[in-house]
Structure formats: structure tokens, C-alpha cells
């Protein structure tokens, strides 16, 4: 059993404070009875919660760490390619989606969830969530490039990336850390410095 205000907040009906106010105004019903107490206990999978006459669908949040393979796209549906959701059909009915995207030829860690608030926190640059990639590349890395990564690199469309970190493991192998996710960003960052990514995996 869980508090009604907690469940409704998780379902994005408002902040915890806003939801409490809505309940006190009688906006919600449980099993046909109008509820006015925000701490009213319900079983979200067994009780019927309604708002303005419509039944609220409740899904428990799920969090999946997927090692995305190559040739699979980061989408919920595609008529041509296999998607990450196709790899886990048992979760499709829970309205899960990938948090961000990896290019079709990129492998590695991808979070799958139905928690929109978490997805926003992970994707928004203002939260500074670092993403780490292992890569191999062709070309010559120069020490002065470290300054470029730290200050931001100007891409082919004129966009300047946020500061990143580049860590050489050995010749033509490195880790790169970024906290944004522009289209083909890692590949384009290296191309701006006359290097070419030959393999990319988020770790």
C-alpha cells in the first residue's frame, strides 16, 4: 500500500505539494469514492484511481541497463530496423523508452525506463551527468588537443560543445567524457581535430 499523493506525484500529476492540494479539493476518486486525504493508502495495481472521470493507468517504474549491440537503433519503433525495445518485448507494454540515443553503429550502455523525470535529469546538460565512451581512432592526437576538449570544440555546423575530457589509454585508443548528446557528437568532435572514430562504445 502506498500514499495516494506519492503515487500521483510519480505519475506526473504535479509536484507533491500540488498533488496534495488537488486531493484536498476532491479531484481524485478511489474505487468510486472521492478522497480528500493526501495520505490515503491505496494499492495502485488493485485499486481504481480516477481523475475527472478517467481511469489513471499505473505502471511501476522500471530501470534497465542495456548493452546495446551494433545495428540496433535507439527508438521504440522503426519499420526498417530492429529497435532496442524489440530486444525486450516483455517490457514494451510498460511504455519504456531509451534515455537518449546511441548511433546505429555504436555499442554500449543505454538506460531503458518509463520514468520521464529521471530521463530528463540524465539528459539535461544542466545536471552535468557525464557519459563515458571508449573509442579507437585514426589520426594523430596532439597534446594541445586537450585544451580544445576542455574549452569546447566547434563542430562543422558552428556549434561549440560544452567542455569535455579526453583520456588517452594508448596509441589510438581513448576514453572521452561528455555531458550532452548532439547528433554524432563524439565523431564530429574528433573530425574537427583531424581524427576519425573507428569504433565507439559507451561504458
Regions found by a protein language model. Name each.
Residues 1-203:
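Basic, flexible Lys/Arg- and Gly-enriched helix-loop patches that mediate nucleic-acid binding at interfaces
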Amino acid at each position: 500500500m502506498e500514499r495516494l499523493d506519492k503515487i500521483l506525484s510519480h505519475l506526473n500529476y504535479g509536484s507533491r505539494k500540488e498533488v496534495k492540494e488537488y486531493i484536498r479539493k476532491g479531484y481524485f476518486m478511489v474505487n468510486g469514492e472521492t478522497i480528500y486525504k493526501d495520505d490515503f493508502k491505496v494499492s495502485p495495481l488493485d485499486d481504481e484511481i480516477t481523475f475527472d472521470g478517467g481511469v489513471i493507468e499505473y505502471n511501476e517504474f522500471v530501470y534497465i541497463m542495456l548493452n546495446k549491440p551494433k545495428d540496433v537503433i535507439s527508438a521504440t519503433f522503426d519499420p526498417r530496423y530492429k529497435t532496442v525495445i524489440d530486444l525486450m518485448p516483455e517490457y514494451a507494454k510498460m511504455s519504456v523508452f531509451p534515455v537518449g540515443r546511441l548511433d546505429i553503429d555504436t555499442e554500449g550502455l543505454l538506460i531503458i525506463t518509463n520514468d520521464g523525470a529521471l530521463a530528463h535529469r540524465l539528459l539535461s546538460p544542466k545536471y552535468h551527468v557525464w557519459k563515458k565512451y571508449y573509442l579507437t581512432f585514426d589520426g594523430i592526437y596532439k597534446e594541445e588537443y586537450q585544451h580544445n576538449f576542455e574549452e569546447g570544440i566547434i563542430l562543422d555546423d558552428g556549434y561549440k560543445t560544452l567542455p569535455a575530457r579526453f583520456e588517452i589509454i594508448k596509441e589510438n585508443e581513448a576514453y572521452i567524457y561528455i555531458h550532452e548528446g548532439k547528433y554524432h557528437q563524439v565523431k564530429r568532435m574528433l573530425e574537427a581535430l583531424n581524427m576519425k572514430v573507428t569504433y565507439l562504445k559507451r561504458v
